[in-house]
Amino acid sequence: MAIWLGRLTGSVQADFAHGVRRFHSLFGESPIKSGCGCSGTGITAKASAAIHRVLNARYGLRFEEHHVLACEHAEHKQGFLKKQHPDLQMLVSTLAELAAAEAKNLLNPQNCPKELIPFLLMFRLGFPCTSRTSLSSQSSENVHCVQKEEGATGIGFKEGFKYVTVHWPFLVMLECVKGLMQKTPDYQLSDMEHIVKQFEARKYWCLPVLLDNVDYGGDSWRERLWWVAVLNLIHGKVTKQEVDQFFFRMLHAFKSPGPLIDTKRYVIIDDEDLPVSIA
């Protein structure tokens, strides 16, 4: 990220600096509580902490993020989360548990009662892509699975979105395969557009964008669909078009001229192979 920040020029640099300082004025005085659905090994929380260190060095602004809520069904990944994320206050097994005010906390002994689910400023709404990935032989049969609330992808989004409707995090980020951009003649909206409408109905600004891995420093093509949703706390002051334009300018500014990492020096492994004790 330090390399990307160094490439910002002109008004984009000023806009970014202003945005970071504005965010810090609102939330920088106390720890930013974050959480994730479908956490895996929680690598996004580790990456987020690295970004905060860069912003501190660049702008002198101290952000402190506490990764307090995780959701993961696989037991070996639960063990990794417990070991590598000491800030965790609650670990649950399924997305459906996040729709309530209380849930069983896997960090505590089995005989403990349910605990209050912590409020989050930032929520990474992970949901499975298995119904719409091109690797699935049934992908073409699952177009609009999000709107139909079917399959792992449709049900996963439904359950994860319930957390938003119950707990109202300020910032929500989502990622899935680009198959959600497809639609058939009998539907007015693609699943991508449907997700945007779901957030807008609850007074969030929501921007969908298709990003390619090679544009941001990767050495191989890997397109993914992302959404950023921000709770609208200043109704009428800023238009959705202005917010969208700002995000698109940021995304364009951060595009890399080539790979930033020499992957020949590293071994890429699946996160399921990571040992619990990894540093």
Report the location of each language-model feature.
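Conserved active-site and SAM-binding loop architecture
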Residues: 1-279
